[in-house]
Amino acid sequence: MIDYDYPLFRPPAEANNIIIQVTLGCSYNNCSFCSMYKTKKYEVRKLEDVYKEIDTIARAYPATTKVFLADGDALALPSEHLLTLLKYLQKAFVKLRRVSLYASAQNILSKSQEELELLQKNRLTLIYYGIETGSNLILKKITKGVGQSDIIESLNLASSTGIKISATVILGIGGELYSNEHIEQTAKIINATRVNYLSTLQLGLEEDAKDNFY
């Protein structure tokens, strides 16, 4: 039905929901531990192409209530672009209750509270967010592009607008040497923010990522 651009990733919780690729790849794509989008160049898909896919899916699944916007960090899209998409989705799926996507600290902090509130009012009510670690030392080593304070600020900004957060931290990302640092500093982030769902991931590096990992 839909000609996806692979590889395609989605959170486990979105397994039974509609997935629509509004971007391809990841706008940052520099994390040393992540190989998910290394084969893709970041691209914003044309609205008319996305609309055609939404219309096709709506005809087949008119009772859809949940939609996940792929790829890596769709919140990188300008707010006006996202708002246009959200309004189109609401017209296509009259029973739509929730739209979700991956987001980073950079994405969130690039938007004002008013912009995020408007997106939330138009059904963007859940973001999936990779904290990875709270350690500034490890964040720098894995080239995450943000520090602990950025993570705390972005999570609290999103939470203040009513957007729910499903966050993940990575077990083992500090290795043996930085294990305590990883635990203690990550706990600081969790205690300083309002995360609705928290999960852990086990560190696993593909061969191409091992060469660049600290």
Residue ranges, per PLM feature:
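Short glycine-enriched, charge-decorated loop/helix-capping segments at active-site entrances
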Residues: M36-K41, K140-V146, Y214
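Short, acidic/polar
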Residues: V50-Y51, S110-L118, N180-K188
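Conserved C-terminal portion of the radical SAM core fold
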Residues: L126, S149-D211
